[in-house]
Amino acid sequence: MNPIKPPFTLNQYFAAWFVHVFTASAACIGVFSLYKIYQHDYVFALWLMAITVFIDAVDGSLARLVHVKSVLPKIDGALLDNIVDYLNYVITPCFFLLVKPGMLPADYVVPITAAITITSAYQFCQDDAKTPDHFFKGFPCYWNITVFYMYIFNTSMIVNTVLLSLFCVLIFIPVKYVYPSRLDYLTESRVLKILMHCCSALYGISSFCLLVNYPETNKLWVSLSLGYVGMYLFLSFYRTYYPMFKAKITANNKD
């Protein structure tokens, strides 16, 4: 009688577990970033926060590459990702806002951070927070990136208050925000997908350089970093509303 072979090789199991541990490592780094914020070492904390963003940016692609759902079906990678992301994208930047002087007016620190945590909890628990066609529905809780820009550009407390309040509201507005690592439904063009990935990489490099050069700011890196943000928002609103306008025009033409 031939022994029953496992459905996957040892290397496949190792690769799948590695990806899950890689994702979970971002939670560990997130705790260290909280510690650095507590020590008022804000630049170091931002570096650690940047590492968690990098991990989040690539772990999904790695998971699909090694087929983690098939190899480890009893491990919920999406749940793990949400747990880690809520720490790094919500709790850590809220702690930054609470600890760092000058980020928010004293009377607004607690209400704003409370609003962020509650609205973000709503965002994370929606069934369609990530839509079937791979977009984020509503503002995708980029609070860590928001705090990064506020710190780098030393924006005023009033500006910070207005922006953070606006983003809390945008969580409830069903705009489809681009999922940078899942571009299949954004465009069918292979060239445009490659171009988008290149732009994302360039954004990472420019943001890296902004942090390296802090407190000095270089116009090139500022332009590239904010230019990507502008492009991201344009594509998100275009992808949300253009199909609606197109369908309405088509319906009117038929009438």
From Swiss-Prot:
Cytoplasmic side: 1-13, 64-76, 125-133, 176-190, 239-255
Main location: membrane
Gene Ontology biological-process entries: phospholipid biosynthetic process
Keywords noted in UniProt: Cell inner membrane, Cell membrane, Lipid biosynthesis, Lipid metabolism, Manganese, Membrane, Phospholipid biosynthesis, Phospholipid metabolism, Transferase, Transmembrane, Transmembrane helix
Record topology, Periplasmic segments: 35-42, 98-103, 155, 212-217
The keyword Transmembrane is assigned to this record: yes
Protein localization: Cell inner membrane
Annotated GO MF terms: phosphatidylcholine synthase activity
Pfam families per the UniProt record, alphabetical: CDP-OH_P_transf
GO CC, any one term: plasma membrane
Regions that span the bilayer: 14-34, 43-63, 77-97, 104-124, 134-154, 156-175, 191-211, 218-238
Reactions this protein catalyses: a CDP-1,2-diacyl-sn-glycerol + choline = a 1,2-diacyl-sn-glycero-3-phosphocholine + CMP + H(+)
Family: Belongs to the CDP-alcohol phosphatidyltransferase class-I family.
Name of protein: Phosphatidylcholine synthase
